[in-house]
Amino acid sequence: MIKLGSHVSFKKPNYLAGAAGESINNKANTMMIYLGAPQTTKRVEFELYKKQEYLDFYAKDIPAEDIIVHAPYIINPANPTKAKFSCDFLIQEINRMNYINAKYLVLHPGAYTEFAPQEALDQLVKSLTHILSKTKDVVICIETMAGKGTEIGINFEQISYLINKLNSDRIAICLDTCHLWDAGYNLKDYQSFKDELKKWNLLKHVKVIHLNDSKNELSSHKDRHANIDQGHIGLETLAKFVHDKDFDNIPIILETPYVDNKPIYDVEIQMLLNKKP
């Protein structure tokens, strides 16, 4: 089954119910939310989530297991000086996810800043090991990054290192097509890309996909999302992810720009579903 949706707002007054309703209007069957603004760790109380309204009216079309939560950008669990704050926050975020029964948390792996890249990778392993020990159920999906600044998680070697060191069924991967392209993976040579995933034994660990076109050339390390078929990757390549049997039942999430101050996820979802290989 194809699971295709987008990022939608989780905001007052309807929070979870409002996000699910918006997704269903877009003809989506999965969705991604932030439990607060992406640039902050401020959160509202569980009681405001409108969970019962979601269960009564929307859970049939978008089950809780297909609600993806994205961690905020501003935490850095790979930085030794900021790891404690990041861990404490993520433990609470997973508790909030448990309340709504969401299964997958997408996490930017962080940046090495003034430290060495290997130090940051090892700190991330320590941070995630601690978080796993203090939480239950939720699977943390490490997102592939574009290589902007001092980001880690920018190639399959680093992602494989993290997966193997953590060695947990609660650690997985979120592929981001824009980030992969900007990091240097030529998705247009789709079979070679899949072969590279398999070479590193990562295909089976992919549990979420962010499907975005890119405003930049291959290997730009910029991370600037474009609308579907309006960037350098193109509809033909991006649709292959949607219709790939290896990615059946894996939530595929659009994070594309607004057009004229509004999202066009409904249009993009139909474009992708209609573009069969």
Curated annotation (Swiss-Prot):
Pfam families: AP_endonuc_2 (PF01261)
The UniProt record lists the keyword Nuclease: yes
InterPro entries, per the entry: AP_endonuc_2, AP_endonuc_F2_Zn_BS, Xyl_isomerase-like_sf, Xyl_isomerase-like_TIM-brl
Residue positions binding Zn(2+) 3: H179, D223, H225
Keywords: DNA damage, DNA repair, Endonuclease, Hydrolase, Metal-binding, Nuclease, Zinc
Cited CDD domains: AP2Ec
PROSITE patterns with a match to the protein in the record: AP_NUCLEASE_F2_1, AP_NUCLEASE_F2_2, AP_NUCLEASE_F2_4
Entry cofactors: Zn(2+)
GO terms, biological process: base-excision repair
UniProt key word Zinc: yes
EC number(s) given by UniProt: 3.1.21.2
Residues binding Zn(2+) 2: E143, D176, H210, E255
Family annotation (SUPFAM superfamilies): Xylose isomerase-like
Residues holding Zn(2+) 1: H70, H108, E143
Cofactor: record remark: Binds 3 Zn(2+) ions.
GO molecular-function terms, A-Z: deoxyribonuclease IV (phage-T4-induced) activity; DNA binding; DNA-(apurinic or apyrimidinic site) endonuclease activity; phosphoric diester hydrolase activity; zinc ion binding
Catalytic activities: Endonucleolytic cleavage to 5'-phosphooligonucleotide end-products
Function: Endonuclease IV plays a role in DNA repair. It cleaves phosphodiester bonds at apurinic or apyrimidinic (AP) sites, generating a 3'-hydroxyl group and a 5'-terminal sugar phosphate.
Similarity-based family: Belongs to the AP endonuclease 2 family.
Protein name as annotated: Probable endonuclease 4
Species of provenance: Mycoplasmopsis synoviae (strain 53) (Mycoplasma synoviae)
Higher taxonomy: Bacteria, Bacillati, Mycoplasmatota, Mycoplasmoidales, Metamycoplasmataceae
Name of the encoding gene: nfo
